């Protein structure tokens, strides 16, 4: 992986690695660089930093590492790390099963880059992804996208992202330093969690919150846990929309439990997702969810509004209306928790183990 920072894909790898380690697998996580603000991991898992800031510069250290160590499986997460892992494995002259886990809709992920860069991404996928042993897609939307990009259907398998129910759910309900912003507040407590990137479309959320305030006369505090390149532009929008008393950017938050527990609603305003891990986390706390019906993930997780409120993408009026309706008509926490259990690592992990055993026996 690139690193083990506080992101959805990184969280998935931490959970999966922990599960495999408990199944007596010898697990190492190779990262380009080690960050201080990273996922907590099982002490039996080896973290091997390549101490490189660029993917291309990581090729030779990675190839050298793979030559010195025999791995049964090399699992690459997300382009371009997938390509790096495949190339280093092939040229290490060691025989390993190369498994990719693709977490995003690649056709959308790089659409803000230059046309030339987008062509390079798509060409590399069409030419190289079919050389992998297998590609795990975290949603049907990711699978469909890779098919369109030229990956053979036989190479693709959908396994939804896992959560670790036993480690993530506890009985604590106190307010921490972040959720203190809600303590004694009587309005709507809205939570969003995710990196501050373009695809999360927080401007859509801010516009919806303005409608919620001006049209529906609601008082609320919206806490956003996450960091990223759009932080300064989002701060400017908060001021422009006069939302300083309503929206708080918390930055990266290591432990979001208190935030989830004390929220009234969880809101996702994205233009697209690969899966939407935060939606599953919100289900685990029995929180009513409002999410844009973007590709892909929200509908696969929430169904046709059985487990959350879905609204059209980039439509502030509809998003505001859904937030208002969801607050007045919250879903049963018991039903949401039951859906959450469908993503337990004890179920999802078995699918990974079964696949790996099949690949090893071929």
Model feature map: region roles:
Residues 63, 116-135:
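Membrane-proximal helix-turn-helix segments that form the acceptor-binding/catalytic region
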Residues 7-15, 188-211, 229-236:
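A conserved mid-protein helix/loop that constitutes part of the nucleotide-sugar donor-binding site
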Residues 1-56, 145-147, 157, 229:
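N-terminal strand-loop element at the rim of the active site
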Residues 49, 303-316, 324-330:
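Conserved acidic donor-binding segment of nucleotide-sugar-dependent glycosyltransferases
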Residues 288-292:
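Short hydrophobic beta-strand element within catalytic cores of glycosyltransferases
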Residues 130-156, 163-167:
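A short, active-site helix/loop in glycosyltransferases that binds the activated sugar's phosphate group
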Residues 76-84, 102-105:
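Short His-centered aromatic/hydrophobic patch
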Residues 252, 271:
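Aromatic "clamp/platform" in nucleotide-sugar-dependent glycosyltransferases that forms part
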């Amino acid at each position: 992986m690139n690193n083990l920072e506080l992101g959805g894909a990184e969280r998935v790898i931490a959970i999966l690695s922990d599960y495999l380690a408990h199944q007596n697998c010898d697990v190492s996580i190779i990262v380009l660089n080690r960050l201080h603000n990273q996922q907590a991991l099982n002490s039996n898992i080896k973290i091997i930093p390549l101490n490189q800031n660029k993917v291309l510069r990581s090729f030779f250290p990675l190839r050298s590492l793979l030559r010195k160590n025999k791995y049964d499986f090399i699992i690459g997460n997300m382009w371009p790390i997938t390509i790096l892992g495949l190339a280093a494995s092939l040229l290490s002259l060691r025989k390993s099963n190369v498994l990719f886990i693709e977490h995003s809709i690649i056709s959308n992920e790089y659409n803000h880059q230059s046309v030339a860069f987008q062509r390079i991404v798509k060409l590399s996928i069409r030419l190289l992804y079919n050389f992998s042993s297998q590609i795990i897609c975290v949603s049907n939307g990711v699978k469909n996208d890779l098919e369109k990009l030229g990956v053979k259907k036989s190479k693709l398998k959908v396994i939804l992202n896992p959560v670790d129910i036993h480690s993530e759910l506890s009985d604590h309900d106190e307010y921490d330093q972040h959720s203190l912003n809600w303590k004694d507040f009587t309005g709507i407590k809205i939570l969003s969690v995710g990196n501050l990137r373009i695809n999360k479309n927080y401007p859509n959320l801010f516009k919806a919150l303005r409608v919620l305030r001006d049209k529906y006369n609601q008082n609320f505090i919206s806490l956003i846990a996450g960091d990223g390149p759009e932080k300064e532009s989002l701060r400017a929008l908060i001021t422009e929309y006069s939302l300083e008393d309503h929206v708080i950017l918390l930055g990266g938050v290591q432990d979001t439990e208190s935030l989830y527990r004390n929220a009234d609603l969880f809101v996702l305003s994205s233009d697209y997702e690969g899966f939407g891990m935060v939606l599953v986390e919100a289900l685990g706390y029995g929180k009513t969810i409002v999410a844009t019906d973007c590709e892909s993930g929200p509908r696969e997780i929430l169904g046709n509004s059985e487990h959350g409120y879905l609204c059209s993408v980039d439509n502030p009026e509809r998003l505001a209306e859904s937030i208002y309706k969801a607050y007045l008509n919250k879903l049963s926490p018991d039903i949401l928790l039951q859906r959450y259990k469908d993503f337990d690592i004890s179920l999802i992990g078995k699918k990974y183990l079964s696949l790996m055993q099949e690949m090893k026996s071929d």
